Amino acid sequence: MMTQPNLNIVPFVSVDHMMKLVLRVGVETFLKELAGYVEEDFRRWQNFDKTPRVASHSKEGVIELMPTSDGTLYGFKYVNGHPKNTRDGLQTVTAFGVLADVGSGYPMLLTEMTILTALRTAATSAVAAKHLAPKNARTMAIIGNSAQSEFQALAFKAILGVDKLRLYDLDPQATAKCIRNLQGAGFNIVACKSVEEAVEGADIITTVTADKANATILTDNMVGAGVHINAVGGDCPGKTELHGDILRRSDIFVEYPPQTRIEGEIQQLPEDYPVNELWEVITGRIAGRKDARQITLFDSVGFATEDFSALRYVRDKLKDTGLYEQLDLLADPDEPRDLYGMLLRHEKLLQSESTKPAA
């Protein structure tokens, strides 16, 4: 980590610095390397403190805290989800995060995580698909072409080799935006007029819609044998994308069951409905894809360990880049037990500066 001579200083990665870091590394390389960190932390799943995120729900959306620790480092993310924000020119999702040293409790990094969350969500989806999707899958349908769609496409290209996209959104302008942004990225892209058209011939179906509703984006008759479904949009109570019959036909894989049963597609199913945990697939404890006709479903809601992985990755990539600010965030008195004395000394400093003659 960047060593700081003053204990009050915490490295801060702004949105501008994050964009520069991503572009310096390269988007696909960033996604591939980040996926490596995500997978590494799933492999040591049992080392982590795990809890469902702490959520404050309203009719407009949700604000959440997502904490975890591996005993050496502690990380958390603040994130919101407000689907109607785009009507007011605002982002649906915004986020920031902190990485801290467990030994001292001191923060080591403060960073924007709106862009970073989009990257880690896509990287996690691709990690899951690497273990669950049909072998040599090359064609992906993306239903919902808003803020997350390009990241999903590029992650699946970088990690699985997906090079054919079939896009659909209720808003044709969103699809046009996605196509425009992915020009020159090496995709064969088809803009589709319906969900049914988009999923035709797809090896992987990604659903990434934003409305906070129990929607039915995919119905049972749209999903054929052998498909992998990457269900990203359902991520809070009352927000789903898939018809329940699809769930009952699929082998379901989740990040953390206590959270996914509240927020994911499986909130539609009984609490004791059997699901598989992704970490067990990644570590080889259980099988992922077993045969060519199996329907696999990654019920993605996003979990704190993935943000922890992203924070670790950014911390490591920042070395020697200068792509951060030194933020005066922590009180650092000369005598740790004399915090009030620090305030008094600063008062004297301000008084002396105010009495200095003008130059």
From Swiss-Prot:
Keywords per UniProt: Arginine metabolism, Lyase, NAD
Required co-factors: NAD(+)
UniProt-recorded Gene Ontology molecular function terms: ornithine cyclodeaminase activity
Keyword Nucleotidyltransferase attributed: no
Gene3D superfamilies: NAD(P)-binding Rossmann-like Domain, ornithine cyclodeaminase, domain 1
Alphabetized Pfam families for the sequence: OCD_Mu_crystall (PF02423)
EC number: 4.3.1.12
KW NAD (keyword) present: yes
InterPro entries linked: NAD(P)-bd_dom_sf, ODC_Mu_crystall, ODC_N
Binding-site residues, NAD(+): 92, 120, 147-148, 169, 209, 232-235, 239, 300
Catalytic reaction annotation: L-ornithine = L-proline + NH4(+)
This protein's pathway: Amino-acid biosynthesis; L-proline biosynthesis; L-proline from L-ornithine: step 1/1
GO term, biological process aspect, one: arginine metabolic process
Active-site residues, record numbering mapped to chain: 235 (proton donor/acceptor)
UniProt: L-ornithine binding residues: 53, 77, 120, 235, 301
UniProt family annotation: Belongs to the ornithine cyclodeaminase/mu-crystallin family.
NCBIfam families, per the entry: PRK07589.1
Role according to the record: Catalyzes the conversion of L-ornithine into L-proline with release of ammonia.
Official protein name in the record: Ornithine cyclodeaminase
Natural source organism: Brucella melitensis biotype 1 (strain ATCC 23456 / CCUG 17765 / NCTC 10094 / 16M)
Source organism phylogeny: Bacteria, Pseudomonadati, Pseudomonadota, Alphaproteobacteria, Hyphomicrobiales
